């Protein structure tokens, strides 16, 4: 609204008036048509009417209104009277100075500040009133015993009632106390929410740290494999200097739809026919225990010439992939393999093979045993401790063969030159290269390739690697960074010919350090994965037990894979773009089979990002022939002998705690007496070891944080990024593909009505996650306590299985295993629930079985990892742990209700139910839960993909005609939009109905009708039922005779006949 006209001193220009309120404009806004109005007038009009108030144009929105600053400044310079002119203020000020004057105007209204007065006065008279005239001003304190302040009015009246004054004072204090309690509750709620958010952030950070550790362990395994393969070839001279090439013919057979190797190379395009020999198809990676890794199979660096008679020597990468996809078994592959030339030498004498030292293989088990020893004078270890991943080699080479050409080539570095041609269709295509240059050495002015975009032209070509040095670009020798940028950013060139150089043995500097650093890295990985492995092993054992009960006790991979009625395409995933939310059923089933065949590997995939499992982070683009069906444990980063190694570690630790710490490796050591005489030394060493592990964990966290900061710096470094010239800094992140974790599915159940209490299906976000009672610190102590029963019992006690966990609280007599022949007739999930209910019948007492309590149930106060998903730092918050305990209680109650309902429906569930499948989901805080989802969703996704493929070549008219006749399939996003529109329409419909009811009520209230009494309402009810049943069980004959023949308007109502028989 505008300013009143009579407040201004003098006449006001009519152009400064608002056309709506006819007052002086206040914060003027203009419409696109040129009209000016007050902001308080035009905004409600536009929101309600949607047009200009002058009715000069069509639709108008509030975003189209603009401020008129010159007009506003002109209005602010007008003279205006004070708003308190009616109270006596005669000041006339500028409009822009009016707010400042109102703050200190003496004629502004103000209230007395004494409690109990509240008289409205002028601001200039408040002080005098409070000092002289106010009856509520204090004049002293009561001397009659209450001690409360005495006002002037009470003193003039002759005193006050102390009891009434004390009651009033007490009430005021109670009101203040209540207000403080409310404020305290609000602050507590706010602090609780803050605490939960911080705990969630800490959990997410811990999960990200674990995933980063797993990713680096995966890279470590891959680099170790590369180093092994290069070390085997280090004795052989390079090609053309002592090597010969021979042709081999191999026969391959697919194993579960996979060939088990990766390829790189190929010509960049079909039109380029003059390719060099370096553009062939080469084997870049071979999966262990795969079809290609068998004896007489492929080897790394083999060049593929033919596949089933089809020449691939000059084929492109895509043609080679298609040839392997369409090849029929048996697949006959012709390859070229480099072999060292045979050298004629005389056998060395026997004295040359004699080693004067003693080979001692010190592995990780020895180190863990030595850390448990007591402190007094332990034996001095060899400073070069080799990790288990790199055991000492016992092979002996001939000195003449091994040292043949080393000395003469010691002072010069062998470089491998290669010319790479890149072609782009238009100037918008990106080459995908990120270049950098050295700044620490003045002599080295070369340009190096730091990163390659996986989806770029260079990555698809596959010949350029990270770390290559660019020598020439299009025949021009590159001297500095500016020349390289100018040549690569030229929009006129579509063909780029790059001459690159790389060492023949390209080794990373990070893996050339001494063995002590390698051992420390392995110790970091073991420490970070210790808690993660235990949680994953328990979940995997639960899933494995359920699969075991379904299949009748068999865990054969072939049996599980035969349950899937799907066919493999013959080649595994060859395009990373297929990893999206709407993945095909074929790929999901492949991952299901892997998770069921190897539960530990399946659970490991839950926490690994895509770049740890795929091949996207290799320095060259490759296509994978590795199907998800045959992926083994080694390929997922877990060695095959890891479980056996872990079991041996447990036995070793048990022996260390139960026997002498030096009796394992030094049976006759004189330090045995010292270890036995000091029983507290073991605990001290354990504490020292735990402190050391915590310090290493903090160091690892700092390394990860520094790595992230370095990545951020690299992203904003202008010298390394050339966005508009075809370069791009590609960063592989953990969170980029985190949504893939929610797409991992388990094998579908045949019929499962309710979720079992052994699984937490988590149908909503409020469900309780899986709760594990596993203590990494106390696990060894529990095993050591039962070590008198044998090492085998200790190992089996450490492995938590569903049977053991369900029988924790049973009596020894009830928990005796027995075979139930009728269990096969029941549904697997029902049988599992019945078994769990048997275990829960004996769990009403607070104490557990003494035999099983020590082995499985550690105390809450002694176990820092009672819940697998609760980090150690989160257990210091009492409110958070209290919340977890409440969730556990709710979960137990829900499981009991689920068991009761399942037992009731065992005999009545004969109807055909929809097929369901298990899905492993992940929450925002990092916890996982298992849920059931109908197979119908997956079928709908496949149907959507099929319809999309069928309609890809249709025109608009054909598509419209098909929608009218055949109906249309709505995608997921469109269905969400439909739900939102339906909710909006329902809300509008309810609003209209409510408005109509309110209107009717107002009309009824406007009429001068008298209010109906109970008798009239009873007559109205009887009129509705006069042609129906006369009376019911709650109506007496007297009521019918009294009310049945009357109506509110006085007319007679003819009811049905009523016969009364008096007995």
Swiss-Prot record:
Positions carrying Phosphoserine: 427
Coiled coil feature spans: 680-705
UniProt cross-references to CDD domains, sorted A to Z: PDZ1-PDZRN4-like, PDZ2-PDZRN4-like, RING-HC_LNX3
Keyword Cytoplasm: yes
TRAF-type zinc-finger residues: 100-158
GO CC terms in record: cytoplasm; neuromuscular junction
Compositionally biased intervals (Basic and acidic residues): 564-582, 746-755
Annotated zinc fingers (RING-type), start-end: 18-56
Region Disordered: start-end pairs: 545-602, 746-798, 834-853
Post-translational modification: Auto-ubiquitinated.
Tissue note: Highly expressed in skeletal and cardiac muscle and at lower levels in spinal cord and brain (at protein level). Also expressed in kidney and lung. In muscles, concentrated at the neuromuscular junction (NMJ).
Enzyme Commission number(s): 2.3.2.27
Comp. bias intervals (Polar residues): 554-563, 756-770
UniProt record, GO biological process: neuromuscular junction development; protein ubiquitination
A Pfam family matched in the record: PDZ
Subcellular location: Synapse; Cytoplasm
Outcome after substituting residue 18 to A: Loss of E3 ligase activity
UniProt free text on domains: The RING-type zinc finger domain is required for E3 ligase activity.
Role noted for this protein: E3 ubiquitin-protein ligase. Plays an important role in regulating the surface level of MUSK on myotubes. Mediates the ubiquitination of MUSK, promoting its endocytosis and lysosomal degradation. Might contribute to terminal myogenic differentiation.
Protein's name according to its UniProt entry: E3 ubiquitin-protein ligase PDZRN3
């Amino acid at each position: 609204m505008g300013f009143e006209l009579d407040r201004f001193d003098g006449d006001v220009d009519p152009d400064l008036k608002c056309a709506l309120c006819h007052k002086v404009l206040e914060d003027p806004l203009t419409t696109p048509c040129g009209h000016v109005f007050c902001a308080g007038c035009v905004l409600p009009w536009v929101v309600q009417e949607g047009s200009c108030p002058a009715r000069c144009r069509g639709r108008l929105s509030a975003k189209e209104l603009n401020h008129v600053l010159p007009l506003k400044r002109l209005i602010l310079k007008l003279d205006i009277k004070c708003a308190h002119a009616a109270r006596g203020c005669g000041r006339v000020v500028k409009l822009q100075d009016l707010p400042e004057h109102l703050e200190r105007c003496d004629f502004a209204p103000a209230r007395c500040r004494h409690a109990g007065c509240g008289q409205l006065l002028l601001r200039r008279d408040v002080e005098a009133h409070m000092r002289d005239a106010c009856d509520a001003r204090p004049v002293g304190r009561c001397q009659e015993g209450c001690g409360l302040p005495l006002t002037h009015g009470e003193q003039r009246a002759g005193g006050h009632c102390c009891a009434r004054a004390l009651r009033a004072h007490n009430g005021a204090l109670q009101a203040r106390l209540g207000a403080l309690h409310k404020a305290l509750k609000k602050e507590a709620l706010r602090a609780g929410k803050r605490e939960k958010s911080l705990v969630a952030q800490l959990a997410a950070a811990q999960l990200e740290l674990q995933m980063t550790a797993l990713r680096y362990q995966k890279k470590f395994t891959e680099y170790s494999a590369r180093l092994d393969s290069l070390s085997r070839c280090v004795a052989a001279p390079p090609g053309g200097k002592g090597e010969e090439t021979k042709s081999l013919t191999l026969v391959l057979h697919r194993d579960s739809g996979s060939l088990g190797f990766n390829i790189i190379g190929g010509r960049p395009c079909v039109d380029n026919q003059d390719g060099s020999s370096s553009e062939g198809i080469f084997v870049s990676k071979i999966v262990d225990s795969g079809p290609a890794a068998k004896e007489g199979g492929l080897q790394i660096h083999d060049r593929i010439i033919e596949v089933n008679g089809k020449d691939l020597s000059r084929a492109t990468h895509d043609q080679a992939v298609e040839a392997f996809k369409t090849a029929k078994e048996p697949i006959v592959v012709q390859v070229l393999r480099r072999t060292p030339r045979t050298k004629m030498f005389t056998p060395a004498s026997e004295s040359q093979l004699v080693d004067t030292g003693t080979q001692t293989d010190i592995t990780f088990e020895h180190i863990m045993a030595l850390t448990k020893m007591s402190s007094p004078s332990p034996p001095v270890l060899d400073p070069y401790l080799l990790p288990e991943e790199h055991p000492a080699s016992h092979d002996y080479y001939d000195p003449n063969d091994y040292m043949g050409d080393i000395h003469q080539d010691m002072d010069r570095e062998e470089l491998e030159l290669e010319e790479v041609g890149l072609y782009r269709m238009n100037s918008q295509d990106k080459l995908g290269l990120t270049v950098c240059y050295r700044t620490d050495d003045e002599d080295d002015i070369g340009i190096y390739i730091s990163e390659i975009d996986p989806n770029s032209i260079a990555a698809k070509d596959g010949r350029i690697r990270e770390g290559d040095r660019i020598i020439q670009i299009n025949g021009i020798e590159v001297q500095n960074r500016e020349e390289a940028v100018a040549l690569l950013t030229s929009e006129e060139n579509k063909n780029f010919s790059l001459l690159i150089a790389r060492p023949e043995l390209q080794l990373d500097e990070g893996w050339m350090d001494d063995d002590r650093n390698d051992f420390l890295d392995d110790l970091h990985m073991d420490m970070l994965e210790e808690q993660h492995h235990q949680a994953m092993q328990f979940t995997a054992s639960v899933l494995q037990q359920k699969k075991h009960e379904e299949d009748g006790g068999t865990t054969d991979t072939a049996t599980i894979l035969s349950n899937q009625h799907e066919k493999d395409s013959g080649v595994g995933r060859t395009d990373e773009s297929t990893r999206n939310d709407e993945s095909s059923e074929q790929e999901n089933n492949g991952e299901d089979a892997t998770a069921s065949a190897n539960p530990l590997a399946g659970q490991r995939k839950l926490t690994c990002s895509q770049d740890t499992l795929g091949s996207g982070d290799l320095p060259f683009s490759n296509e994978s022939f590795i199907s998800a069906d045959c992926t083994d444990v080694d390929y997922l980063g877990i060695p095959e002998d890891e479980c056996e190694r872990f079991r041996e570690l447990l036995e070793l630790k048990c022996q260390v705690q139960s026997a002498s710490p030096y009796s394992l490796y030094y049976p006759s050591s004189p330090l045995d007496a010292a270890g036995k005489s000091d029983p507290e030394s073991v605990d001290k060493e354990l504490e020292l070891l735990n402190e050391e592990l915590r310090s290493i964990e903090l160091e690892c966290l700092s390394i990860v944080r520094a790595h992230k900061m370095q990545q951020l710096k690299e992203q904003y470094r202008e010298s390394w990024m050339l966005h508009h010239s075809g370069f791009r800094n590609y960063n592989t992140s953990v969170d980029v593909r985190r949504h893939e974790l929610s797409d991992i599915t388990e094998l579908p159940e045949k019929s499962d009505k309710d979720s079992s209490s052994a699984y937490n299906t988590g149908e909503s976000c409020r469900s309780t996650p899986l709760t594990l009672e596993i203590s990494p610190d106390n696990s060894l102590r529990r095993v050591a306590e039962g070590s008198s029963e044998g090492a085998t019992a200790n190992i089996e006690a450490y492995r938590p299985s569903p049977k053991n966990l369900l029988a924790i609280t049973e009596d020894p007599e009830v928990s005796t295993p027995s075979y139930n022949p009728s269990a096969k007739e029941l549904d697997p999930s029902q049988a599992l629930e019945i078994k769990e209910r048997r275990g829960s019948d004996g769990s009403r007492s607070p104490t557990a079985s003494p035999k099983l309590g020590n082995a499985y149930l550690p105390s809450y106060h002694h176990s820092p990892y009672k819940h697998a998903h609760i980090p150690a730092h989160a257990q210091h918050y009492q409110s958070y742990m209290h919340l977890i305990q409440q969730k556990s209680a709710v979960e137990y109650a829900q499981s009991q209700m689920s068991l009761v309902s399942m037992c009731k429906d065992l005999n009545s569930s004969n109807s055909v139910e929809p097929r369901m499948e298990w899905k492993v989901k992940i929450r925002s805080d990092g916890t996982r839960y298992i849920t059931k989802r109908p197979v119908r969703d997956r079928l709908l996704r496949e149907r959507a993909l099929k319809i999309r493929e069928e309609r890809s070549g249709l025109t608009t008219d054909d598509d419209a005609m098909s929608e009218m006749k055949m109906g249309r399939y709505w995608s997921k996003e469109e269905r969400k939009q439909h739900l939102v529109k339906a909710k909006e329409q329902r809300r509008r419909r309810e609003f209209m109905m409510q408005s109509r009811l309110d209107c009717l009520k107002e009309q009824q209230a406007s009429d001068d009708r008298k209010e109906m009494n109970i008798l009239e309402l009873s007559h109205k009810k009887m009129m509705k039922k006069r042609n129906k049943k006369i009376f019911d069980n709650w109506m007496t004959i007297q009521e019918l005779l009294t009310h049945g023949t009357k109506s509110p308007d006085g007319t007679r109502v003819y009811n049905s006949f009523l016969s009364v028989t008096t007995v």
